[in-house]
Amino acid sequence: MASQGTKRSYEQMETGGERQNATEIRASVGRMVSGIGRFYIQMCTELKLSDYEGRLIQNSITIERMVLSAFDERRNRYLEEHPSAGKDPKKTGGPIYRRRDGKWVRELILYDKEEIRRIWRQANNGEDATAGLTHLMIWHSNLNDATYQRTRALVRTGMDPRMCSLMQGSTLPRRSGAAGAAIKGVGTMVMELIRMIKRGINDRNFWRGENGRRTRIAYERMCNILKGKFQTAAQRAMMDQVRESRNPGNAEIEDLIFLARSALILRGSVAHKSCLPACVYGLAVASGYDFEREGYSLVGIDPFRLLQNSQVFSLIRPNENPAHKSQLVWMACHSAAFEDLRVSSFIRGTRVVPRGQLSTRGVQIASNENMDTMDSNTLELRSRYWAIRTRSGGNTNQQRASAGQISVQPTFSVQRNLPFERATIMAAFTGNTEGRTSDMRTEIIRMMESARPEDLSFQGRGVFELSDEKATNPIVPSFDMSNEGSYFFGDNAEEFES
């Protein structure tokens, strides 16, 4: 929990390590990404991919998905027990794209899961290397966060679509561990809890018996994870109430939705990590870079450095804008889907536009799309500056809430004001302050009302030149205070279909 004195850094969560010093953490994260890189190189050899094909992000995603599927114990067991027509539970595969006579062709490949597991373990010194698998899951999750909207999922659980900025990590699989829990947004945790409570309301046996006991433990654990994301005493006290409820029902759902709304201004601590596609690590390992010796961090300069020197390609549909495709992948690489566009634009050095203005669809290509008209382009993933990733919501001075915006969850530790429409947010809090949590609700509303949009978050924090790897000279950008900074403004993205 973030509240106890046992904070582990993301890197420790990512590598399953106990407390380590900075050098050990850098080494173990380095070991993790070099394992991913070695695995990727081996897969390219197995599939006889050319250098160009191996740098294609769509091929990287297929290979990543294959290894995640090969290690998905629960699904593998389920598939063996419920054989479905035409699905071999022991095999995994996907589309691989190859260049043939000046055209891109799609080839569906199939591999034994056992074989994939063997290659993965071999690349990771014989270990299962769960941390590396989680790392790939987080990269896929960050890509989904930048690509799709979750309006339907929000509405289904009774939440407001404008709360999209709280939904980081909403497509992460259940098995993503502590590193996964750290990057989940407040809205994601609330949605998982509401789904659980609804099942309990509809199914009398959900909380009963031996299974029910396990369910209850999972429920309390999720409540504790969410509690640890809140930074004010009143929000945490409300979470205690929700967790201790004998028979969670509609009152708890109400409380959770209230808390999610409050997080638009009293933001939660949500971790951000730059997780890159496997092919990027593969390229670096192939060029002789020794991650373990050099060390690596997901929250410092290293991912920026790596992207400065990597050439990754992407398939482009006929009417897509390659620059927009690059923006999408850049945001995914830095987990910046919910960051203020003013900050992202400054760091990237080119204007980052809201999603409603992007002429691009997702990175993955559906199996029914026509390959004849597909082209490929280099993704521009370089940046002008680098900045440290944050794990706080950017609330100003200690526990007092600062301004949040209807859709920002800061990614970079860079000074800015957080523009928000207080009237819009506060309108959601009229009325209901009675019941067991009334004093906490009143306290939370009071804190929100005293938040000022002109307050600075991350005071004195700046970005750094790419040559400044020790972060000695912060450059504090000045932003146009009034500017709308939301990526999801005027959104028209596709819904995420699980």
Swiss-Prot record:
Pinpoint motif Unconventional nuclear localization signal by residue range.
Answer: 1-18
Q: What is the protein name stated in its UniProt record?
A: Nucleoprotein
Q: What processes in GO biological process is this protein linked to?
A: symbiont entry into host cell; viral penetration into host nucleus
RNA-binding as a keyword of this entry, yes or no, is yes
Q: Which organism is it from?
A: Influenza A virus (strain A/Chicken/Hong Kong/37.4/2002 H5N1 genotype X2)
Q: Where in the cell is it found?
A: Virion; Host nucleus
Residue ranges annotated as motif Bipartite nuclear localization signal: 198-216
Q: How does it assemble?
A: Homomultimerizes to form the nucleocapsid. May bind host exportin-1/XPO1. Binds to viral genomic RNA. Protein-RNA contacts are mediated by a combination of electrostatic interactions between positively charged residues and the phosphate backbone and planar interactions between aromatic side chains and bases.
